A protein has these predicted regions:
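N-terminal membrane topogenic signal
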Residues: 12-19, 206-208
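Short loop-to-helix capping motifs
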Residues: 48, 52, 106, 171, ...
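Hydrophobic transmembrane-helix bundles of small-molecule transporters
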Residues: 168-278, 303, 446-447
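Transmembrane helix-loop junctions and nearby membrane-interface residues
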Residues: 102-109, 191-194, 224-230, 251-255, ...
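Alpha-helical transmembrane segments of multipass membrane proteins
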Residues: 99-100, 165, 218, 222, ...
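12-transmembrane solute porter fold
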Residues: 17-42, 53-62, 66, 73-75, ...
Length: 481
């Protein structure tokens, strides 16, 4: 019996395992934290390596690009080798690469180590999710995803604090050294908690699909990074266009070949299709907010970085504060009403951000951002749960790889879109007259963009994901067009 078959049987015959979900969530936290924690250490790293701070950005781009490019092959690798082996190996690679990062003597070595670290991270997140999903009955999926969502909400809160504290009181090397005991503990726990399973050696790798998909995703990530860092230059737009072309070619290939890298028929499941499109827009818009807010507070209001950072933390206070209530809300009202409410309420808070200025009372700003963060958390949790509600066990590897890739792209696209809106609304002479004008336009634009997610949620059936939201057992149909 293959691993996917044995785990499907396990999910149907036993309750979910909170310790396994907590282990996977902990590895997610390491990966998410390392994606952003380096920002606060850039000046120190630049000083040690005798380079300008802008040069150090390549280490972040290399990491994010490797993660995004590695995710598409994760489903095939887990099926071929076995999810337990891949997950444990990913933790080992990530931990070893963290040590190499700390031992780096120059920027080239650090960048290479970050690529290796990204390769480990690319396998940890989707394969870890797959391990949990395969061992979780439908009626417990909402509880399981509640564990898996918190790293994405908590890591942005702690990353600046952890990075700043380690760099200030120790050195930037400890940003990576701290992963070693955590990684070793996670590796030992994985050996004990992750169930064994035989891989399917008959699964051949779709090399054409792999090359087209990874090249397309890589070009998109690089293009979004370039478009954000150098909006006046054409390289970002060219890279994004090339990435979209490669992704389109990959879709055509995956639909025609008999042995695709991942199955696109998962989009025949209505809940997965709707939450992939609406969820992408939702994650894109909420990713733009932490980018726009500190810029508005510093450039528009004239605040110092610390003042701005404390105020932005209000968003993440709302994220964490509402988290215990998200599961009861979904159980009480169902997915569709919760998604419609979260996206509409988020759009309203974005529009209200456009009304802020330097004279707005700070407690009022803080309260608005706490509310925005709470709505962000509700929608984030709901999308993470419903996307797998009607996916059958055999489709999980493909659905998981596609979803993880879209999440990674949405985060980068959100920052790029925020920067694009700022540029569009920065008319010559406007900034001098009203330094907040461009930010007002940008926040109104992302509010309108969020309404597209609302429209997508309205198209869902009233009982969409009911087996998950109501905690009912039962196997879903393979497709629900």
């Amino acid at each position: 019996m293959s691993e996917s078959q044995s785990n499907a049987a396990s999910a149907a015959s036993q309750k979910w395992q909170p310790r396994l979900a907590l282990l996977v969530a902990a590895t997610f936290f390491m990966e998410f934290l390392d994606g952003t924690v380096l920002t606060t250490a850039i000046p120190s790293i630049a000083g040690d390596f005798a380079v300008v701070p802008a040069d150090v950005n390549i280490t972040m781009t290399a990491y994010l690009m490797t993660v995004a490019m590695g995710i598409p092959v994760s489903g095939w690798l887990a099926e071929r080798v076995g999810a337990r082996k891949v997950f444990c190996a990913a933790i080992a690679v990530f931990t070893a690469a963290s040590l190499l990062c700390a031992l780096s003597q120059d920027l080239t070595m650090l960048t290479a180590a970050r690529v290796l670290q990204g390769a480990g991270g690319a396998m940890m997140v989707p394969v870890g999710t797959l391990v949990v999903l395969r061992r979780t009955p439908k009626e417990d999926l909402l509880r399981a995803t509640a564990y898996l969502v918190w790293p994405g909400l908590l890591a942005p809160v702690l990353a600046p604090l952890v990075g700043g504290a380690l760099t200030t009181f120790l050195s930037w090397h400890w940003i990576f050294l701290i992963n070693i005991p955590l990684g070793l503990a996670a590796f030992i726990a994985a050996l004990r908690l992750v169930p064994r399973g035989a891989g399917d050696q008959s699964r051949r790798l779709d090399w054409v699909g792999l090359l087209l998909t990874t090249a397309g995703v890589g070009a998109l990530v690089v293009g979004l990074e370039l478009a954000t860092a150098h909006p006046s230059e054409p390289f970002g737009a060219v890279s994004v266009a090339a990435g979209l072309g490669l992704v389109a070619a990959a879709v055509l290939w995956l639909r025609r070949t008999s042995n695709p890298l991942f199955e696109l028929n998962v989009f025949g499941t209505r809940t997965f299709r709707a939450t992939s499109t609406g969820g992408f827009i939702y994650r894109l818009t909420i990713s733009a907010v932490p980018f726009l807010l500190p810029l508005m507070f510093q450039d528009g209001f004239g605040w110092d970085p610390l003042h701005a950072g404390v105020m932005v933390a209000a968003v993440f206070v709302g994220n964490i504060g509402i988290k215990p209530a998200t599961t009861p809300l979904i159980r009480r009202f169902g997915f569709k009403p919760v998604l419609v409410f979260a996206s509409l309420a988020s759009a309203v808070t974005f529009a209200l951000c456009a009304l802020l200025d330097s004279g707005t009372p700070e407690p009022l700003i803080f309260a608005l951002l706490v509310c925005s963060g709470a709505f962000r958390s509700i929608g984030f949790s709901a999308y993470a749960s419903i996307q797998y509600a009607d996916i059958v066990p055999g489709q999980l590897p493909s659905a998981n790889a596609i979803s993880a890739t879209l999440v990674q792209l949405a985060a980068g696209a959100g920052i790029a879109v925020g920067a694009l809106f700022l540029r569009l609304f920065s008319a010559p002479g406007t900034f001098e007259a009203d330094p907040v004008a461009a930010y007002r336009g940008a926040f109104l634009a992302i509010a309108v963009l969020m309404l597209l997610s609302t429209a997508d949620s309205l198209a869902l059936h009233r009982q969409a994901g009911a087996d998950v939201s109501r905690g009912r057992s039962g196997a879903p149909k393979a497709a629900n067009p």
